[in-house]
Amino acid sequence: MVAIKDITARQILDSRGNPTVEVDLLTDGGCFRAAVPSGASTGIYEALELRDKDQTKFMGKGVMKAVENIHKIIKPALIGKDPCDQKGIDKLMVEELDGTKNEWGWCKSKLGANAILAVSMACCRAGAAAKGMPLYKYIATLAGNPTDKMVMPVPFFNVINGGSHAGNKVAMQEFMIAPVGASTIQEAIQIGAEVYQHLKVVIKKKYGLDATNVGDEGGFAPNISGATEALDLLMEAIKVSGHEGKVKIAADVAASEFFLQDDKVYDLDFKTPNNDKSQRKTGEELRNLYKDLCQKYPFVSIEDPFDQDDFHSYAQLTNEVGEKVQIVGDDLLVTNPTRIEKAVQEKACNGLLLKVNQIGTVSESIEACQLAQKNKWGVMVSHRSGETEDSFIADLVVGLRTGQIKTGAPCRSERLCKYNQLMRIEESLGSDCQYAGAGFRHPN
């Protein structure tokens, strides 16, 4: 048996310059590293990301307490354990070493989901090496998936930013392109990159050079006023790139960010202080707006169209457009099996956004994915806006056979390292894999 010999944790910086946790896990087979991401628009039901709150350092965002928890609590308990026992190690960290719970399950508020996840991911890499497998194949075995014919995902590139990710007036957070008409991941990434480069030219011509600055996830944030303006830019870029018909559109609305709790309305002008309230919409009005957009543009997926507790509006929209358009829960579900069960019962959505740091372990991420797939949902594996050079989710999406991933624009190294890893995986698999393409919601 291979055993864990040592664990070293440290504070590093993510793509926004904020501290995050990195772990080196040592076995007889070598040293295995993992670093965790963090989000800007976070759902209130996510597992706890432990921050130091010392305002004299990194504006309170240090993670030295999480690092200390790894060294003092997690490491002594894991020395000598078999890294191939992923479930056992995750369970030990979550239920015994941490042990904190809320109504939605294990919340990791003692040790921090960032501490637990870093160790969980490093352990997964060590387990793969011990079994002599590439990480994606090892994850497939953990999930009980076949390893003979793998599925390469459709990449959803976030190329125009609004919402909390941008300084423009657009309420919706992400406008994405999805090259479903490609035949390989390599071709899909090429199409995505070409549309992105043409979009840059289109934006520069219309709004000037400074409009091509990029946001946290590599997308552009031109000074546009609303969703239709953003979508028209996308359609123009797709057209001039010569990829019409091969590229569909998706959006992450992140509606919880502009839901006014007291008035129970959505404010599409939420970034203008003391605005005239003319852009406020009820759940029903917002639903009708989405339906209009879906008729006008080639939408295949809409994420977080309503507030994270507005199960009713979700269910109505899913009922009305869900066959043609995937309705994805992110803040609604926070990769949490208990929240997924509730959404299944209420028929609230038909897609899960899978973010490993929302739930905090590899095992629970696999469980959430399997629960969604069992209920015939789509599953989109996702990065966070604060990322690192760790490409774990590229292997995860192939291992879990979800057929779809979003990890930013084809720009900025912390995004590209995931796309580049997907191309490497496809190359190593050769004819033993297929591109999910138009069937990305239910890849066979």
Swiss-Prot record:
Cofactor(s) named in the record: Mg(2+)
SUPFAM superfamilies, alphabetized: Enolase C-terminal domain-like, Enolase N-terminal domain-like
Main location: cytoplasm
InterPro entries per record: Enolase, Enolase-like_C_sf, Enolase-like_N, Enolase_C, Enolase_CS, Enolase_N
Gene3D superfamilies (alphabetical): Enolase-like C-terminal domain (3.20.20.120), Enolase-like, N-terminal domain (3.30.390.10)
Residue sites binding Mg(2+) per the record: 252, 303, 330
Compartments in which it is found: Cytoplasm
Keywords from the UniProt entry: Cytoplasm, Glycolysis, Lyase, Magnesium, Metal-binding
Catalytic activity of the protein: (2R)-2-phosphoglycerate = phosphoenolpyruvate + H2O
Cofactor remark: Mg(2+) is required for catalysis and for stabilizing the dimer.
Binding site for substrate: 165, 174, 303, 330, 382-385, 406
EC number, as in UniProt: 4.2.1.11
NCBIfam families, A to Z: eno (TIGR01060)
Family of this protein: Belongs to the enolase family.
Quaternary organization: Homodimer.
Descriptive protein name: Enolase 2
Gene name, Swiss-Prot/TrEMBL: ENO2
